[in-house]
From Swiss-Prot:
Organism: Trichlorobacter lovleyi (strain ATCC BAA-1151 / DSM 17278 / SZ) (Geobacter lovleyi)
GO function term, MF aspect, one: nickel cation binding
InterPro entries on file: Ni_insertion
Disulphide connectivity of cysteines: none
Descriptive protein name: Putative nickel insertion protein
UniProt keyword Cell wall biogenesis/degradation present: no
Domain of life (superkingdom): Bacteria
Length: 394
């Protein structure tokens, strides 16, 4: 599986995203040719890119030149378009199906965020900054680049909130602007940055529509690294978006899981054991407890569990109900799971399931326990016999 990880700790914008994809190898001529399928007039824009310095780092800067553009500002004049107009333009184009789908997903995120921020119907949303030709190029260009690179999955780091104020078509707004703040829901953010708009609406929409936020960079085999430079220079950090392109290890499946934990100092061993049983019965991937020293020198236990994201609410409810804790910590993480399958083997002691992976085979614990109880044998003896017979058959 080919994945792309965006290190957006310094920020992200639409032009920076396209610049990263160009730096990863997408030809500018291909981008230009594919954008021509949108049906915009030939004279609507001219594309260029160049290597620039941002705070001691080198990155590619992507520029959309407009016929009426003056100076270096990307939004001197705006072609106001409604979400319905843009949706129809993409649908009617001759772009590839996947490019259309990705573009529509991004614009839908933008439209819904703008509608909520300004209290209008989605189809009545008028894009100003986003509706300009250069931003349409940024969004559809991102989709074209991801398709050309054959990216299967996108991940992103935490993004900076920024600070201060920004001038928009709706007036002077705090950073992040209302629509951007809406788009940041569900994404990891940090405040370890100076003032200024570090995440634009277009950049936030790209992440909200296509990327899975992660606390740590996923385990991957990196093949290329791209650097996309923003238009501004910041005093605190280089205004660079990095993209790591690579593959997940073939022998493992990659998945997102959650770790939930809480500190306990007023539960009995019986209550703790019962809670763990209930969590396993509810589908927790793993549950354990760790002795800890708490405040006021009190001994306690840290109860921890792993679960899938969709199980979170049920698990939190169970932990609070059974332990009486007032809070549960949550951490999202990635794990690599060895590909495996189950084989059923007929042994001299009975039927035993074996878990098979590239690392070897292992009899199922529960099956071995059942046989040990039924035959009055030691568990380790049962495991030795069934392993030997399984290996002999193979």
């Amino acid at each position: 599986m080919r994945i792309l990880y965006f290190d957006a700790t310094a920020g992200i914008a639409g032009d920076m995203t396209v610049a990263v994809l160009l730096d990863l190898g997408v030809p500018l001529t291909h981008l230009n040719n594919e954008l021509g399928r949108l049906g915009l007039p030939h004279e609507a824009f001219v594309l260029s890119d160049e290597q620039v310095q941002r705070g001691g780092m080198t990155g590619r800067h992507f520029v959309v030149h407009l016929p009426h553009q003056h100076g270096h500002h990307r939004h001197d004049h705006h072609d106001h378009r409604s979400y319905a107009d843009i949706r129809q333009m993409i649908a009617a184009s001759s772009l590839a199906g996947r490019v259309k789908d990705l573009s529509q997903q991004i614009f839908m995120q933008l439209a819904e965020a703008e509608a909520k921020a300004h209290q209008v119907a989605v189809d009545q949303v008028q894009f100003h900054e986003v509706g300009a030709v250069d931003s349409i190029v940024d969004i559809v260009g991102t989709a074209i680049g991801l398709d050309w690179l054959k990216v299967d999955r996108v991940y992103c780091s935490a993004v900076p909130l920024g600070g201060g104020f920004v001038q928009t078509a709706h007036g002077r707004l705090p950073v992040p602007a209302p629509a951007t703040a809406e788009l940041l829901k569900g994404l990891a953010v940090h405040a370890d940055c100076g003032a200024g708009e570090r995440v634009t609406p277009t950049g936030a929409a790209i992440l909200a529509a296509l990327a899975e936020p992660v606390t740590n960079m996923p385990h991957m085999i990196i093949s290329q690294v791209g650097h996309g430079a923003g238009s501004r220079d910041f005093a605190d950090v280089p205004n660079i978006l990095r993209g790591f392109l690579g593959e997940l290890p073939e022998q493992a499946d990659h998945e997102t899981i959650l770790e939930l934990s809480c500190n306990l100092d007023d539960v009995t061993p019986e209550q703790l054991g019962y809670t763990m049983e209930q969590l396993f019965a509810a589908g927790a991937l793993d549950v354990w407890h760790t002795p800890i020293q708490m405040k006021k020198q009190r001994p306690g236990q840290m109860l921890s569990l792993l679960c899938r994201p969709e199980q979170k609410d049920r698990m939190v409810q169970l932990v609070m109900k059974e332990t009486g804790t007032l809070g549960v910590r949550l951490q999202q993480m990635q794990r690599l799971v060895q590909q495996r399958r189950i084989e059923v083997c007929q042994t001299s002691l009975g039927t035993v399931r074996f878990k098979i992976s590239q690392q070897g085979s292992k009899p199922e614990y529960e099956d071995c326990c059942r046989i040990a109880r039924e035959r009055g044998l030691a568990l380790r003896k049962v495991q030795q016999i069934v392993r030997r017979e399984y290996c002999h058959e193979r």
